Amino acid sequence: EHWVLLGSNGAGKTTISRIAAARLFPSSGAVDVLGERMGRVDIAELHPRIGLCSSALAGQVLGGESVLSVVLSASYGRIGVWHEEYDDPDIERARALLEALGAGELVGRAWATLSSGERKRVEIARALMPDPELLILDEPASGLDVAGREQLLAALTEILSAPGSPSMVLVTHHLEEIPV
């Protein structure tokens, strides 16, 4: 299933997406994500089940981090590689995701050297890396020119139409950014 959160600035779309991604706890009430009750589940176990692409998360990446490390670290629900070890299948998956999103040539580049369009592609590859059950894309086309937006939406449409693709929540201001 795929959903869209469509609304104006300040409507709470990003707040809802952060709660759904288990990155923000609600101030009241109860929230279940992927069958798990927030506050009763180990967030470290829940994060790899949720792929998140958001400018807030991207802002936490260190500038010197390589594109490959940015994508790989999502396997553990972390930002940046620390002490984790990655094997060849992990590296192959990260490279394949970057390639599918038109960012294969960026593998060795540092995060700080990327344009906003390149960063968006890497962020989405990162969100898909753990093979999530739920994919949350918070304004994935923001900052892209028309051609870049169309390329990104085409890649997303292809990825999300594949068998076994994750459920998706897309946050946007624009109807034309909703993949078919």
Write out the residue ranges for each language-model feature.
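Conserved ABC ATPase "signature" region
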Residues: 72, 87-106
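Conserved catalytic motifs of ABC-family nucleotide-binding domains
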Residues: 131
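Helix-to-loop junction immediately C-terminal to a conserved catalytic motif
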Residues: 21
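Hydrophobic anchor residue at the start of the ABC signature
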Residues: 124
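Conserved ABC ATPase signature
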Residues: 85, 110-114, 118
